[in-house]
């Protein structure tokens, strides 16, 4: 594959603090738009939430290959929905406002980062998509149930926010039922 597990393991031991995000090229040109949108969303998030009440989708994933493949699809869906919604506007100014008011997508790579984002923006969370296994803190060991713990904590505060758990292990379905989550299983989840 273009971004092997060997490369992923080498990156883990590197100091990447100078970089906001690391992506892998999987041949999808939509990744470039996703990178730009992700950075724009992060930069504009606080202003857009406070001033306009924009909602956000929280994606919790530490797998570079996985978030490099899901973000283009997620952005394509959100942008398409926003374009369709903006056609209902009465004039050009309203259309522009509706497009700018699209849900922001925020990527968290640890439990701690996800909880900080959740607590700061919990009234504007449109939904959460989470992996099951990721570190609790930056550069920490992976916790095999971090995503489940995240869903449990969020569910305590909000019984209605949509939660999606993505996992390569169907055994996690009992957790999904317990916390009222949708479980998406795939054989291609990144380690």
Regions found by a protein language model. Give the residues of each.
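Conserved acidic segment of CheY-like receiver
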Residues: 53-65, 70-94, 105
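A short, hydrophobic beta-strand element within the central beta-sheet of small alpha/beta folds
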Residues: 1-9, 20-24, 61, 126-129, ...
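Short, flexible/disordered intra-domain loops and linkers
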Residues: 6-11, 72-73, 136-146
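Receiver (REC) domain switch/output surface
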Residues: 11, 16-21, 26-46, 73, ...
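Short amphipathic alpha-helix used as the core "switch/output" element in two-component signaling
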Residues: 116, 137-160
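Conserved small/polar residues in nucleotide/adenosyl-binding loops
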Residues: 184-190
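Short acidic, S/G/P-rich loop/turn micro-motifs used as interaction or catalytic elements
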Residues: 3-5, 29, 63-67, 112-114, ...
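Acidic, metal-coordinating helix/loop segments flanking the phosphotransfer/catalytic sites
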Residues: 85-127, 135
């Amino acid at each position: 594959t273009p971004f092997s597990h060997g490369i992923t393991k080498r990156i883990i031991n590197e100091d990447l603090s100078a970089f906001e995000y690391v992506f892998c090229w999987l041949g999808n040109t939509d990744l470039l738009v996703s990178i730009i949108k992700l950075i724009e969303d992060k930069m504009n998030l606080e202003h857009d939430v406070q001033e306009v009440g924009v909602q956000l989708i929280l994606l919790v994933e530490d797998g570079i290959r996985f978030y490099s493949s899901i973000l283009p699809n997620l952005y394509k869906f959100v942008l398409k929905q926003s374009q369709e919604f903006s056609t209902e506007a009465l004039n050009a100014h309203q259309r522009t406002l509706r497009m700018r008011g699209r849900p922001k997508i925020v990527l968290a790579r640890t439990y701690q980062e996800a909880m900080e984002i959740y607590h700061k923006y919990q009234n504007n969370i449109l939904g959460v998509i989470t992996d099951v296994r990721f570190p609790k803190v930056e550069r920490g060991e992976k916790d095999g149930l971090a995503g489940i713990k995240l869903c449990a904590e969020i569910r305590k505060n909000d019984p209605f926010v949509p939660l999606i758990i993505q996992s390569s292990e169907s055994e996690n379905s009992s957790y999904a039922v317990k916390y009222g989550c949708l479980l998406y299983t795939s054989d291609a989840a990144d380690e």
